[in-house]
């Protein structure tokens, strides 16, 4: 049935309903699409827990392929009081992987909260990414200013993404695009060696010849520098939904929650908030705008009924249905 699905996905605004799938069988279907095509797949789970389960399941099915994960930046959904630096790192890694994607397609797993968050524009990310190689000359004061501009915090020792330290001719920096921090050793103004190191032991792990430092993708957003994930996706992308109607309802509710939170910030009830001078449309895409973005994509929906079966949608989209008729195995 994978070939039938791939055939239905050829039109740029394809709409396909997979009827009668159960449990995690959809992950087998998505992995089969990956193996038999060059489509990039964006799988939109219902929530963070569901997304992590899908990512782990796909990673087990496709051991040699890194399954990308786009989480939300905040520790609590739509509560802007505390960002999760590890999640910002994962978001940056996903964008970096999409920027450098080779032929064959990527698989990204996300959920509504995370998808609604705006991202730095593609050209802005490229422009603000620093590349270093051994043997290059750098000015340490310039590096210091640049890291601060990139949203990094100077500390005595580096433990988390977004931190850096300078001790003599050694610069430690935890990029928002790498699982381990980097140690840059200088001889005068020349990069003598580059290594990754363990933040727990502070001991060097692996020597490398070049590195990429990605900025805090949530820092210094203006209306002109933000975009959506769709800017990073190739034309041959398929969007997967467990329940598109539920998704539409959820993004409306969550956007209303975000508006309420922003009203508290603007009213001064939350003192000295970092987003005091920002607007909500610098951080989140409005539900109607997100739906417009999705309308231009290929979509696969699961379940026995599709939102695209109503008359209004059928005037615009041609819905194809594939029946799997799976039944639960007796326990």
Model-predicted regions and their roles:
Residues 1-331:
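Conserved beta-alpha structural segments and adjacent helices that either
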């Amino acid at each position: 049935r994978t070939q039938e699905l791939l055939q239905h996905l050829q039109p740029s605004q394809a709409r396909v309903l997979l009827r009668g799938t159960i449990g995690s069988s959809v992950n087998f279907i998505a992995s089969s699409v990956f193996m038999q095509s060059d489509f990039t797949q964006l799988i939109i789970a219902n929530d963070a827990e569901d997304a992590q389960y899908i990512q782990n399941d796909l990673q087990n099915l496709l051991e040699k392929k890194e399954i990308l994960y786009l989480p939300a930046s905040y520790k609590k959904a739509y509560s802007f009081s505390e960002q999760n630096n590890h999640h910002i790192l994962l978001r940056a890694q996903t964008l970096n992987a999409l920027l450098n994607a080779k032929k064959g397609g990527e698989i990204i797993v996300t959920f509504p909260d995370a998808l609604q968050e705006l991202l730095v524009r593609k050209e802005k990310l490229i422009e603000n990414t620093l590349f270093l190689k051994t043997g290059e000359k750098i000015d340490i004061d310039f590096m210091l200013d640049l890291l601060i501009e990139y949203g990094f915090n100077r500390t005595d020792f580096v433990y988390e993404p977004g931190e850096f330290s300078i001790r003599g001719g050694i610069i430690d920096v935890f990029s928002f695009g790498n699982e381990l921090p980097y140690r840059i050793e200088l001889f005068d103004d020349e990069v003598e060696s580059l290594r990754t190191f363990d933040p727990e032991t502070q001991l060097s792990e692996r020597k490398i010849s070049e590195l990429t430092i990605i900025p805090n993708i949530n820092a210094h957003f203006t209306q002109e520098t933000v975009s959506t994930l769709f800017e990073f996706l190739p034309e041959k992308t398929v969007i997967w939904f467990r329940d598109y109607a539920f998704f539409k309802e959820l993004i409306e509710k969550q956007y209303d929650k975000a508006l309420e939170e922003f009203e508290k910030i603007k009213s001064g009830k939350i003192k000295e908030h970092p987003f005091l001078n920002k607007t909500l449309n610098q951080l989140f895409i409005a539900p109607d705008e997100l739906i417009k973005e999705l309308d231009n994509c290929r979509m696969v929906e699961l379940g026995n009924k599709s939102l695209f079966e109503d008359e209004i949608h059928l005037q615009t989209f041609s819905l194809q249905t594939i029946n799997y008729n799976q039944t639960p195995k007796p326990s």
